Amino acid sequence: MAGGKGKSSGGKSSGGKTSGVDGTKKQQSHSARAGLQFPCGRVKRFLKQNTQNKMRVGAKAAVYVTAVLEYLTAEVLELAGNAAKDLKVKRITPRHLQLAIRGDEELDTLIRATIAFGGVLPHINRALLLKVEQKKKAKAIEA
C-alpha cells in the first residue's frame, strides 16, 4: 500500500452502487425503474410535443401518465379476454372490446368513442320480456 490508506483501486473510485461486472452502472430505462411495460420516454416525448408554449414536462409526470395508460389498457384487455373466453374464442376482436367496455359502467362513461366493427349491445325492453315470460309460464302450467 504505497502512499495511501486502504486498498489501491487503480485510479477508479468505488463510490456509488455498482451492478455491472466491471464495476460500471448498467443503464436502466425509466419504464424499467418504474416497473412498467409501456415506454415512459415515448410518452414524455408525446407530452412535450402536444403542450403549448414549449412548456416543460417533468419525468415523474411522464411516468404517472404511462402508469395510468398501462392500467387502463390492462383493465380493458382483461375484460375483453373474459368476453372472448365466454364466447369460447381464443382471439380478442373489436366485438369483445365493445362488449367489455359497454359492460363496465365506469369504462363506458370514460370511453364514449365508437369502436369500429364493434357492433351494438343486445337490448330487449323489459315490457317485452315480461310478456314472453308470462306466455312461457302459461304454457308450462297447461302442459
Curated annotation (Swiss-Prot):
Keyword Acetylation: yes
N6-acetyllysine modification, residue list: 5, 12
GO biological process terms held by the UniProt record: CENP-A eviction from euchromatin; nuclear-transcribed mRNA catabolic process, non-stop decay; regulation of transcription by RNA polymerase II; silent mating-type cassette heterochromatin formation; transcription elongation by RNA polymerase II
Annotated compartments: Nucleus; Chromosome
Post-translational modification: Acetylated once deposited into chromatin.
GO cellular component, one term: nucleosome
Keywords associated with the record: Acetylation, Chromosome, DNA-binding, Nucleosome core, Nucleus
UniProt biased composition (Gly residues): 1-18
Protein name according to UniProt: Histone H2A.Z
Function: Variant histone H2A which can replace H2A in some nucleosomes. Nucleosomes wrap and compact DNA into chromatin, limiting DNA accessibility to the cellular machineries which require DNA as a template. Histones thereby play a central role in transcription regulation, DNA repair, DNA replication and chromosomal stability. DNA accessibility is regulated via a complex set of post-translational modifications of histones, also called histone code, and nucleosome remodeling.
InterPro entries assigned: Histone-fold, Histone_H2A, Histone_H2A/H2B/H3, Histone_H2A_C
One Pfam match: Histone
Annotated SUPFAM superfamilies: Histone-fold
